[in-house]
Amino acid sequence: LQLLPVLLAHADRVQAILICGRNRELHHELLHWRTEHPEFRCHLEGYSESVHLLLQASDVIVTRGGTTTCAKALHFRCPIVFNAFGGIMPQESLTWKFFRNGAASEKIEDAGDFARVLGRWLDEPATYAAVRENFLRLRYEEDPTTVIDELVALGNEVARAELRRQPFPPPEAGPA
């Protein structure tokens, strides 16, 4: 809720997807807020199985440093602004350090920080483009066959075997 006034100030230029998880009280507060501010375009969801789709439709995600959410954001090319209201929790610190060191990801500790980040990006689109480019440099495209070969090699090492990856489905056996 603390970030909504910042977004509202830019209602003519931004929109938001708000996900509340299973927090029904927050969901009701946001429904009420949205009713009072029809000029701001926002999509509101409780718990969602569609986060992967919502990330693909987003230019940025503001989130805590949960590893799963951050990995999904990276996979779907959606830069992260880390919500550090109350600080970075110990279980979030490695994820935060990875994205801070690797992509110079932004961290916000209050609505003022968010206003500065959003204002800079809106006033200087090249700044957002650079943030996104840095973020995308953290990605790598993995060839699934490479992973399979590495797993087979690891299995061979443990089992002291010499197996090789086989095509799937296996070729039809000829007449005997």
Positions of PLM-derived features:
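C-terminal amphipathic helix plus adjacent low-complexity
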Residues: 125-176
